[in-house]
């Protein structure tokens, strides 16, 4: 049966690091102080039962998944679905991944409506892409079509996006004047389907 080799508490961050194993093999697990208290505060040398070990492993995995999610979101914006799938690909369980995504949403690190607005505005005003291209592109990143439509409509209503003006800028940038070429460009950049 595994034994507790060390316990390190951090009352500010409200978590505890427990070293469990034998003299040759030590693994560190991070749990909340509440979980540590629920285990009846095991001290150095005490044995850990199967049930307690399962609880410690589950909570440690959730803690690591949350930290990894913060790292992924620091790189760039992701949808809830994309973040969850990335965590699962990294080897975390579905439950730990879902918990990490929920925690990111609760703390405001993952705000899909705001992310969508920024992404739609960037695609429309800077990359000069049309409504249908934007929908296809962002749906491929894991955002729902209804949320994408809502973000596009909101930005158009606020006057932040004018697809007709953007198309004229695109034609001017490309030096296109004939109607045939303009029609071709409309389809290619998603102004028409």
Predicted regions and their residues:
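An alpha-helical, amphipathic repeat domain used for nucleic-acid recognition
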Residues: 1-193
């Amino acid at each position: 049966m595994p034994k507790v080799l060390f316990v390190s508490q951090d009352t500010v961050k409200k978590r505890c690091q427990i070293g469990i194993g034998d003299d040759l093999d030590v693994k560190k697990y991070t749990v909340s102080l509440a979980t540590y208290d629920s285990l009846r505060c095991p001290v150095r040398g005490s044995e850990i039962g199967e049930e307690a070990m399962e609880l410690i492993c589950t909570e440690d995995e959730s803690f690591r998944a949350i930290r990894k999610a913060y790292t992924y979101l620091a790189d760039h914006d992701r949808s809830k679905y994309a973040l969850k799938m990335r965590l699962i690909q990294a080897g975390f369980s579905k439950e730990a991944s879902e918990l990490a995504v929920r925690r990111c949403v609760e703390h405001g690190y993952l705000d899909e409506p705001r992310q969508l607005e920024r992404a739609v505005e960037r695609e429309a005003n800077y990359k000069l892409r049309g409504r249908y291209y934007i929908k296809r592109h962002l749906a491929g990143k894991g955002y729902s079509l209804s949320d994408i439509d809502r973000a596009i409509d909101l930005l158009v209503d606020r006057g932040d996006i004018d697809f007709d003006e953007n198309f004229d800028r695109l034609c001017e940038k490309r030096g296109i004047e004939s109607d045939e070429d303009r029609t071709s460009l409309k389809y290619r950049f998603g102004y028409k389907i």
